[in-house]
Amino acid sequence: MSIIADRNTRLMFQGITGKEGSYHARLCAEYGSNVVAGVTPGKGGQTTVQDVPVFDTVGQAVEATGANMSLIFVPPPFAADAIVEASDAGVPTIACIAEGIPVSDMVKVVHYLEGTETRLIGPNCPGLISPVEKVKAGIMPGHIHKPGRIGVVSRSGTLTYEAVGQLTGMGIGQSTCVGIGGDPLSGTSFIDVLEMFESDPDTDGVVMIGEIGGSREQDAAEYVKEHFNKPLAVLIVGQSAPPGRRMGHAGAIITGRAARAEEKIK
């Protein structure tokens, strides 16, 4: 069993005809994911990698293929509209891989999604993978993962890969690995993922990786105190980061005492 996506998930790629979209659609399909559709306005009727059909709109793709999860690979200026289009078409789960979306756009998106049933993962995230279910909905390297019973949730994509690589190297497999993204405004939170892992009978423990910026780690700590009953290992990175300097992610910046690594570790 996995959380968020499983072997029955029907994946759609918005921006599938672009270089990154087509490349990762192929890798996801090769891993075992059920990639059923792509969307690029003006290119409907074509086929792309693995003979996946391309549609002009998300609505057309959903109607024709039953796609129920979308990965967004469109350029940052158009990513917010792509998220809203997928939500309007009734897609229940969206993982926005795109990086560099204007904060003003995400303010509108987050507000818009509050009144919907859509789950947004990201933006600026690697997506998710379940080695148990052989489903990859994102950009993480599939070969480093091993089926098992440890969940992983992280703000950082590359640190997720590092943690997973070490777990696999020690013979410890993973149930589901979720990258929630490093932007200041995002959808699914640490708490959301921890709640799902808590309810998942096939996850025995969790590795959580946080970083400087914001207060999501502190919020998760408060949740864990009262509601999380499984073993949890937490890594907070950025202890040497200088205040006011962005460290990779748009949200990885110390703007106050609570955003510092040492405060999160407390």
Where are these regions (language model features)?
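Catalytic-core regions of core metabolic enzymes
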Residues: M1-K266
